[in-house]
Amino acid sequence: MKNNHIPVLLNEVLDNLALKENGIYIDLTLGMGGHSKEILKRIPKGKLIAFDKDDFAIKNASKTLSEVANNFEIIKSDFKDFKEELSNLGIYKVDGILADLGISSPQIDNAERGFSYLKNSALDMRMDQSQKLSAYDVVNLYPVEKLEYILKTYGEVKNYKYIASKIIEARPINTTLELANLIKSVTPQKLLKLKNPAKNVFQAIRIEVNNELDSIHQMLSSVEDLLKVNASLLIISFHSLEDKIVKNYFQELTKPKLPSKMPIQEDKFFATRRIYPSKQELNLNSRSKSAKLRILTKIKD
């Protein structure tokens, strides 16, 4: 398969990782290998450890990276477990960590994966094809209260109670377009002009299937001790739920830990403001539109 994937905010990632040729770097979301490939080119004496739980992504990215160098290792794992996986390799400190959150373009574009509300497929949405829970299970087996919670919390769907009740009434729902068309049919005409109403519903179901937000929380809890001094954590997010988790974590690590009257202590971490794609990148890659990059740098042990 030809890899036409365009990595988001690539130059900004490479600049802010401050790559050292002998450094150890972690890509928590390998995907099609776009970021990892460029990192590898710049660390000839270093090591790249990349994580993904999607077999399709791992297979294709492995070929991409092998064309550049062999000083990398790919681990099939949810990034929430990355600290344990690194420990198994004897790695306890790293020079930089990157996470490009959410769904990848190939996952959307491959209709058979069931992520797209524009292409017909079985309801799937599993990033890890070996796991049992799928979108079909969420749509057809969850009780109405749990559906309501998912739609409200993970999709920020305004009419979440109504949508959940209509999903229950229409069961069984077998395909992505069945679900998308159902949502469209029960959405007021004036709202249809704003955006496809299935977008947020599909987002909510996908997040539930892949346990995405809990994984982000668990991943972040492992970062603090792994970063060397002057090493950075870079996180690209694409929607407000992800970004809020990252923002709150960064604020927690950078805010003063002592009462104001206590002796001043130097901060251990420094966080930058969000970085957005340039106009040039937006013109080349429209899917980068909602991307935001946050950077946390460790400045003291």
UniProtKB/Swiss-Prot annotation:
Alphabetic keyword roster: Cytoplasm, Methyltransferase, rRNA processing, S-adenosyl-L-methionine, Transferase
Top EC group: transferase
Record-linked Gene3D superfamilies: Putative methyltransferase TM0872, insert domain, Vaccinia Virus protein VP39
Binding site for S-adenosyl-L-methionine: 33-35, 52, 79, 100, 107
Catalysed reactions, as listed in the record: cytidine(1402) in 16S rRNA + S-adenosyl-L-methionine = N(4)-methylcytidine(1402) in 16S rRNA + S-adenosyl-L-homocysteine + H(+)
Molecular function in Gene Ontology: rRNA (cytosine-N4-)-methyltransferase activity
InterPro entries for the chain: RsmH (IPR002903), SAM-dep_MeTrfase_MraW_recog (IPR023397), SAM-dependent_MTases_sf (IPR029063)
Pfam family for this entry, one: Methyltransf_5
Segment forming the signal sequence: none
EC number: 2.1.1.199
Cell compartment(s), UniProt: Cytoplasm
GO cellular component: cytoplasm
GO terms for biological process, alphabetical: rRNA base methylation
Protein role: Specifically methylates the N4 position of cytidine in position 1402 (C1402) of 16S rRNA.
Protein family: Belongs to the methyltransferase superfamily. RsmH family.
NCBIfam families xrefs: 16S rRNA (cytosine(1402)-N(4))-methyltransferase RsmH (TIGR00006)
Name of the featured protein: Ribosomal RNA small subunit methyltransferase H
The organism of origin for this protein: Mycoplasmopsis synoviae (strain 53)
Gene: rsmH
